[in-house]
């Protein structure tokens, strides 16, 4: 409730003056009595005013109290109604087991969808201090009474004063007047400045015109020359052409300006008059009036558009006088010609959007000279020069684009041809070679060459086996090509990819065959025309084992040039391949790949590739595999008389067990082999490079027991002379260095080979698990040649083969003996 102050008047002012004015002034007692009476009257009046004010206040309070009492009475009535309804509702609520349906959801539905009402308070509920201003407000003007005097009909007068479009039109109409006022003020300021500058000197230099950061040409003009030209009516509208500056001028600024004296002032005055009258008339009346600054900006933009394809030239600096250089006239002609192409609407918009910057308006009369005549021939010459320049630049750009396109097209064509010619094609089981690297035999530790044939796919009988350990000539600068291959090249370095079992990555060899053949003929002196590559790897499965798990399988091959080769073994599946090079599906292919060791003296172990084994898919395949492997083990070496004399490198074992992979090639012209031995004799051949010392002791013990137990089984076999093929070559020099455990074994068992211990003994061990250990004695053994070792292996293999052939189901013992050895 607002507080209201009441101003109480003076007591004596409220009293009546007649009471003390009519008293005799000479009687003071009468005067005092009259004043006292008038004061009492004033007090009474003050009390009356206060009473009235209090009555108003208490009346409002009384009304508020009455309203509050009525509302309280209403609340009491509602409470009584609620009390009457609650018992019935309480019974229904208590009877319910689930009360979730009684949840209040009205507020959740109301708040997202607030009703758009005008007043949130009811009229009766507003307090009096809010309602009082509404009551005191006057009603809107009764404009509808004037509609009878308006021709637009009823409601037109109220719309006239409440329509927003009316105010928009009024504000739009007031803007041009404000712009005109600004123009007049700025022009008056420019005229005063131009007058002062014109009186300072007769000649001024125009410098430091900035076109987008570049300095334009500096030009000087003489007021005397300009005045003489004005007398001859040959003065022209001079403007800077964009080609002289080099780029499109975005903003023009000048530090000093030249003025032709009173002539410039007159031109400015005429400009202001003509511009205020009709801006569009300046375009039609060419030569009659000067060009404004807005027109000058349009001139520069039009000229820049004509030479937009020109490259930005370097800044040119020249000093010339207007009457001495005809080039300036040509530029003036082009500028005046461009003025005609400007639309009046564009100029009008520029005039309305004129900026308030003094720097821009200060250049209104700068470099502007009235022109009345034109030199048509010079102007046409300028247009021809511009056209020729544009054509030359266009031809140059087109020529550059065509050259780039032809180069790119040639590159794309060469790339596509390269991909088409270098990609190998595989069709079913056939391997189509697009390079002279044909399929070749892979043997353990050797390379198969053909003596005097060009294509191994059509000549089979000429294939011969040779052991190769030729010295590889290399240097520190050249690094061997990192291509994964199982071919017969010692110069290729394996990249050692991580190969999963039953998967072989396809390799595209990009080596030039002719260059490689010439290199091999010069360095290795190999008598062949085409290199024979490996057989197709479509059905080959390669599985790698870490060299750390089998430390005894590491071999260190020492060559004269300190190169170490790691060997790996590939075994084809039983499925026949389509190439004629593979005469037998059960052949064992081995290949040596070059691997450069950093320091072979510090470490006796060379990095070798782990052995790879076939994973048989069924038990029947395994049985047939074992039978053929047992037969193949009896034909390890079939040396030909025409073998090349190749020196064999020294082999030093690291863990005391040496396994030699001797190459062989089965001759299809030979007769069929004898019948296979019984299945009880069949053992799975597991190629291994070496075992632990304890395993070797067990194997030696088992071999000794087997040969002593079955001494009589091979007595009849020994009577027949076996067919032994001995590889004898005077150039073959092989030195085998064995450690103590190998030496003890060789001295105790004579010429029994380490390959036999690693191959046959392991086979026996897989069938007999209860073997006793044999204590070894350390003895020294002498060096033996490789020829003796191979002869012993062949003799033992042929003896067992003939024994098996002579058995032929006669019920002999199924054991072997070592009595004849």
Swiss-Prot record:
Q: Any keyword Translocase? A: no
Ranges annotated as spanning the membrane: none
The yes or no answer to whether the keyword Transferase is present is no
Q: Name one GO biological process term.
A: actin cytoskeleton organization
Q: Where in the cell is it found?
A: Cytoplasm, Cytoskeleton
Keywords associated with the record: Actin-binding, Cytoplasm, Cytoskeleton
Naming one, the record's GO cellular component terms include: cytoskeleton
Which positions fall inside the WH2 domain? 756-774
Point to the regions of Acidic residues compositional bias.
Answer: 807-821
Free-text tissue specificity from the UniProt record = Expressed in expanding cotyledons, expanding leaves and expanding siliques containing developing embryos. Detected in unopened flower buds and in the expanding tip region of roots. Reduced expression in mature leaves and mature cotyledons.
Which domain of life does this protein belong to?
Answer: Eukaryota
- Basic and acidic residues bias: start-end ranges: 226-250
Q: Identify the InterPro entries for this entry.
A: SCAR/WAVE_fam (IPR028288)
The residue ranges flagged as biased composition, category Low complexity, are 592-612
Locate the compositionally biased regions of type Polar residues: 206-225, 252-265
Which molecular function term from Gene Ontology is one that the record holds?
A: actin monomer binding
Entry function: Involved in regulation of actin and microtubule organization. Part of a WAVE complex that activates the Arp2/3 complex. Regulates trichome branch positioning and expansion.
Tell me the subunit arrangement: Binds BRK1 and actin. Interacts with SPK1, ABI1 and ABI2.
The text of the family note is: Belongs to the SCAR/WAVE family.
What's the record's remark on domains?
Activates the Arp2/3 complex and binds actin through the C-terminal VCA (verprolin homology/cofilin homology/acidic) domain consisting of a WH2 domain followed by an Arp2/3-binding acidic motif (A), separated by a conserved linker region (C). Binds BRK1 through the N-terminal Scar homology domain (SHD).
What is this protein called in UniProt?
Protein SCAR1
Which organism was this protein described from? Arabidopsis thaliana (Mouse-ear cress)
């Amino acid at each position: 409730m607002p507080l209201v102050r009441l101003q109480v008047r003076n007591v004596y002012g409220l009293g009546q003056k007649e009471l003390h004015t009519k008293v005799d002034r000479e009687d003071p007692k009468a005067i005092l009595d009259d004043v006292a009476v008038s004061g009492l009257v004033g007090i009474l009046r003050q009390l009356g005013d206060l009473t009235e004010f209090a009555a108003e206040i208490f009346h409002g309070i009384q009304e508020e109290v009455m309203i509050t009492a009525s509302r309280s009475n209403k609340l009491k009535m509602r409470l009584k109604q609620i009390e009457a309804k609650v018992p019935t509702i309480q019974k229904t609520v208590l009877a319910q087991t689930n009360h979730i349906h009684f949840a209040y959801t009205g507020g959740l539905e109301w708040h997202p969808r607030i009703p758009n009402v005008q007043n949130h308070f009811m009229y009766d509920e507003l307090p009096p201090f809010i309602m009082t201003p509404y009551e005191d407000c006057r009603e809107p003007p009764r404009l509808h009474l004037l509609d009878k005097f308006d021709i637009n009909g009823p409601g037109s007068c109220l719309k006239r004063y409440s329509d927003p479009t009316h105010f928009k039109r009024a504000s739009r109409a007031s803007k041009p007047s404000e712009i005109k006022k600004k123009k007049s003020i700025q022009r008056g300021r420019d005229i005063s400045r131009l007058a002062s500058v014109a009186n300072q000197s007769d000649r001024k230099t125009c410098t430091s015109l900035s076109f987008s950061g570049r300095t334009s040409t500096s030009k000087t003009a003489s007021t005397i020359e300009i005045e003489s030209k004005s007398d001859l009516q040959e003065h022209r509208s001079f403007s800077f052409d964009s080609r002289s500056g080099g780029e499109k001028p975005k903003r023009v600024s000048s530090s000093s300006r030249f003025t032709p004296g009173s002539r410039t002032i007159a031109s400015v005055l005429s400009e202001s008059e003509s511009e205020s009258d009709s801006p569009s008339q300046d375009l039609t009346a060419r030569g009659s009036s000067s060009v404004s600054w807005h027109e000058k900006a349009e001139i520069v933009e039009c000229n820049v558009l004509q030479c937009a394809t020109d490259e930005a030239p370097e800044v040119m600096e020249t000093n010339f006088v207007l009457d001495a250089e005809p080039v300036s006239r040509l530029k003036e002609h082009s500028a005046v010609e461009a003025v005609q192409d400007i639309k009046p609407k564009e100029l009008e918009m520029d005039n309305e959007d004129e900026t308030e910057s003094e720097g821009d308006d200060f250049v209104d009369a700068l470099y502007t000279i009235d022109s009345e005549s034109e030199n048509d021939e010079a102007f046409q010459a300028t247009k021809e020069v511009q056209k020729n320049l544009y054509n030359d630049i266009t031809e140059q750009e087109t020529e550059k684009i065509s050259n780039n396109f032809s180069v790119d097209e040639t590159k794309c064509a060469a790339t596509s041809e390269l991909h088409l010619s270098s990609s190998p094609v595989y069709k079913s089981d056939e391997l189509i070679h697009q390079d002279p690297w044909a399929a070749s035999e892979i043997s353990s530790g050797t390379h198969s060459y053909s003596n005097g044939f060009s294509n191994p796919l059509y000549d089979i009988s000429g294939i011969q086996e040779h052991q190769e350990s030729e010295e590889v000539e290399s240097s520190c600068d050249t690094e061997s090509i990192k291509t994964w291959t199982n071919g017969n090249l010692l110069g290729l370095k394996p990249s050692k990819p991580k190969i999963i079992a039953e998967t072989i990555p396809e390799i595209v060899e990009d080596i030039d065959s002719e260059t490689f053949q010439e290199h091999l003929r010069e360095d290795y002196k190999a008598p062949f025309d085409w290199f024979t590559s490996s057989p197709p790897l479509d059905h080959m499965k390669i599985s790698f084992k870490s060299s750390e798990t089998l430390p005894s399988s590491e071999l260190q091959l020492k060559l004269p040039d300190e190169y170490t080769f790691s060997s790996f073994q590939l075994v084809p599946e039983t499925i026949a391949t389509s190439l004629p090079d593979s005469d037998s599906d059960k052949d064992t292919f081995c290949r040596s790949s070059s691997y450069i060791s950093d320091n072979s003296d510090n470490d006796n172990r060379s990095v070798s590739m782990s052995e790879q084994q076939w994973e048989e898919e069924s038990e029947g395949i395994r049985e047939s595999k074992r039978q053929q492997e047992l037969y193949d083990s009896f034909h390890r070496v079939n040396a030909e008389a025409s073998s090349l004399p190749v020196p064999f490198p020294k082999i030093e074992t690291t863990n005391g067990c040496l396994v030699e992979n001797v190459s062989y090639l089965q001759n299809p012209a030979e007769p069929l082999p004898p019948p296979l031995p019984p299945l009880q004799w069949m053992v799975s051949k597991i190629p291994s490079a070496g075992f632990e010392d304890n395993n070797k002791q067990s194997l030696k013990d088992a071999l000794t027991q087997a040969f002593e137990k079955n001494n009589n089984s091979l007595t009849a076999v020994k009577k027949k002379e076996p067919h032994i093929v001995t590889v004898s070559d005077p150039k073959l020099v092989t030195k085998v260095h064995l450690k103590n455990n190998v030496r003890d074994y060789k001295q105790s068992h004579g010429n029994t080979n380490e390959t036999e211990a690693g191959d046959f003994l392991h086979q026996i061990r897989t069938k007999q698990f209860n073997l006793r250990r044999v204590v070894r004695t350390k003895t020294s053994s002498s060096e033996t040649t490789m020829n003796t070792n191979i002869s012993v292996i062949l003799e033992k293999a042929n003896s067992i083969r003939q024994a098996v052939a002579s058995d032929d189901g006669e019920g002999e013992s199924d054991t072997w003996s070592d009595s004849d050895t």
